[in-house]
């Protein structure tokens, strides 16, 4: 029940993560059409002898409000940190307009939905069972 879907991969062995990540990237590509680069944001960290990778699949890079003009425009182009929950607002006026409802709408536009998540999981399971 989050407003953005995320895959969390963890292992003490980065080679295992690389293997799983490669398969996940392929599964995402079977559901979300790539243009020049894969559509996801990725955060990774190493703590307590454990690697963690968070992958946020994306439908698009920017919501429709980004392309509006004048006072209707909202400069929202979420990167890794934003997708992880720390919202960076490049303009004060946009920050002052943020509400839970608006942020939910913005993230829903750029994030995959539950149906797409389930399709990625289906393709991933097929790859892992080979």
Regions found by a protein language model. Name each.
Residues 1-130:
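Conserved His + Asp/Glu catalytic blocks
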